[in-house]
């Protein structure tokens, strides 16, 4: 219970902390819309802030797909899932409003062109991309749950579930690695949609 409570507090405050951190860092960071030299000039603090929003599609993917297939994985992966991911996933599932609040907070505070604060392009890009991955996971999760239970627990259904989980997990991992490197990920369709939304993007 203490772990769940701690995670809940951290999750609810993470956007507030990120916003304050960005505001303070803005005084010392020169925002450069030409991102050709992003890898060398983007500070570590900016890179770390840009990966925080990916918790949203991660837990959505775990809720819709991961919880059904992870318990059947090799023994070595089960303790990691049960001790670290499962308690946080239970908290996320029991507080559905959390995902919705995070969704709108990310969009209105970090993504919008008329955002109340000035945000680095790398943070805006990854925030928008995490929102799209969240929507993709939610959509496919709703479609999967619409099928009869007989299909969902069948071999084919679990195979589809497994494929969707690894698709979401791999895209999130790829995006986080790129963000830590100070680079922009290039996920087909999704990243292109982000480029359309985020003005001033430059590879």
Curated annotation (Swiss-Prot):
Gene Ontology terms: cellular component: chloroplast membrane
Main location as per UniProt: plastid
Lineage top rank: taxon: Eukaryota
Location of this chain's protein in the cell: Plastid, Chloroplast membrane
Keyword Plastid attached: yes
Membrane topology: Multi-pass membrane protein
Keywords: Chloroplast, Membrane, Plastid, Transmembrane, Transmembrane helix
Keyword Membrane included in the entry's annotation: yes
One family name in Pfam for this protein: TIC20
Transmembrane feature ranges: 2-22, 51-71, 84-104, 131-151, 153-173
Family: Belongs to the Tic20 family.
Name listed for the protein in its UniProt record: Tic20 family protein Ycf60
């Amino acid at each position: 219970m203490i772990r769940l409570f701690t995670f809940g507090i951290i999750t609810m405050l993470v956007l507030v902390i990120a916003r304050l951190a960005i505001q303070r860092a803005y005084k010392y960071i020169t925002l450069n819309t030409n991102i050709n030299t992003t890898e060398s000039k983007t500070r570590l603090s900016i890179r770390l802030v840009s990966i925080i929003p990916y918790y949203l599609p991660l837990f959505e993917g775990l809720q819709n797909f991961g919880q059904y297939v992870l318990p059947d994985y090799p023994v070595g992966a089960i303790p990691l899932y049960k001790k670290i991911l499962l308690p946080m996933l239970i908290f996320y599932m029991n507080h559905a409003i959390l995902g919705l609040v995070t969704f709108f907070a990310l969009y209105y505070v970090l993504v919008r062109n008329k955002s109340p604060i000035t945000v680095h392009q790398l943070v805006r890009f990854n925030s928008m991309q995490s929102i799209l991955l969240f929507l993709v996971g939610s959509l496919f999760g709703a479609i999967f749950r619409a099928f009869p239970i007989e299909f969902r627990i069948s071999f084919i259904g679990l195979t589809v579930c497994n494929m969707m989980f690894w698709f979401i997990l791999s895209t999130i991992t790829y995006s986080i690695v790129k963000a830590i490197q100070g680079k922009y990920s290039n996920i087909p369709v999704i990243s292109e949609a982000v480029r359309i939304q985020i003005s001033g993007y430059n590879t």
